[in-house]
Amino acid sequence: YKRQILITVTSILSGCNSTSDEEIISSQDFKENYEVSSYGTEEKINTLSDVELTSSEKEYSDLENAKFFLENNSNKEYHYSKAYFEIEAEQSETWYQLTQLYDPSKDNEDDAVINSTERLSLPFDISSVYGELPSGHYRIIVSISYFESPKDWDYDTYYLACEFTLK
């Protein structure tokens, strides 16, 4: 009987120590829990001089107010996903790829077009895809593609990043 009580108490106590997938990410955990970003090393970012990803502010108190824009000042049209984006966190001058709670493009991989000289608002729901983020320095990354010959699927992909701080 004592053994059953001990096992029950141990189970209850260990359950109190378990973590949830949606818990707040701790900034101290970046190096231990996340991969170092391939953007900027294997994958080049912000290589287009006339297409950029910008934000309405450089600092946000919460992610609900974060607004990002895709600006095409070129004479070309580019394709992008309305749903897919990545968030990375910087710690000790190293960028880490944060883990998505789910792939936002899984249910809706709409291919969208940004025309020449167009500026579009990108309504990304960062909290839904990444959960609550601690204060820190981040960047959002999107990919765009230029189709040289759409019928042949001849295209080039470019990665755009915009840094921001979460207070």
Task: Label the model's feature ranges.
Residues Y1-Q4:
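Conserved small/polar residues in nucleotide/adenosyl-binding loops
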Residues S20-Y102, S143-K167:
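Primarily secretory-pathway and cell-envelope proteins
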